[in-house]
């Protein structure tokens, strides 16, 4: 029985050597799982993700003066409401939080920029004018939302020193 066991070792070593050496070329290439935007249909599909998924209305309302004064009886429904209504630093990272709004808007801007880049790569055909317009609109809207939530109100006196938001016009 012992002799039969040792007969299989050379075959196993040979099989392992062949298996491991045959993967060399496959592992040398970096996988690229990005979708190539090379047709009108793919660009149109990409624009579906150029809209923010986060609803910023609650955040805007809670940090504004558009609220009822209930005296000492007001209680927050969740941590997001408490932080927004009392102007505390935002630590809440769930749905509709400042954190998710920031990330979702920049994901949407990236999708719009990808569509615009694909349209430019295709030579700006007039058949893609509606998609180009939608991508520009989505990019502008997302920047508008971000600047209204995260930036100071414009002041000619302090506009050169006030911080704004990163304005993304190209793919990263």
What are these regions (language model features)?
Residues 82-150:
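Conserved, well-structured interaction surfaces
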Residues 1-21:
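Sec-dependent bacterial lipoprotein signal peptides
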Residues 67-68, 131-138, 159, 168:
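Acidic helix-start/capping segments at beta-turn-to-alpha-helix junctions
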């Amino acid at each position: 029985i012992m002799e039969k066991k040792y007969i299989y070792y050379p075959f196993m070593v040979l099989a392992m050597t062949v298996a491991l050496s045959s993967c060399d070329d496959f592992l040398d290439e970096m996988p690229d799982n990005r979708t190539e935007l090379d047709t009108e249909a793919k660009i149109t599909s990409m624009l579906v993700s150029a809209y923010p998924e986060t609803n910023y209305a609650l955040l805007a309302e809670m940090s504004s003066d558009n609220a009822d004064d209930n005296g000492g009886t007001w209680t927050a429904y969740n941590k997001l409401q408490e932080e927004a209504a009392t102007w505390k630093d935002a630590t809440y990272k769930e749905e509709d939080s400042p954190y998710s709004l920031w990330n979702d808007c920049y994901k949407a801007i990236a999708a719009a920029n990808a569509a615009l880049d694909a349209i430019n790569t295709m030579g700006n055909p007039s058949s893609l004018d509606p998609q180009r317009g939608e991508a520009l609109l989505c990019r502008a809207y997302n920047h508008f939302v971000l600047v209204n939530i995260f930036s100071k109100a414009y002041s000619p006196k302090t506009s050169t020193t006030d911080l704004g938001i990163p304005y993304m016009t190209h793919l990263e």
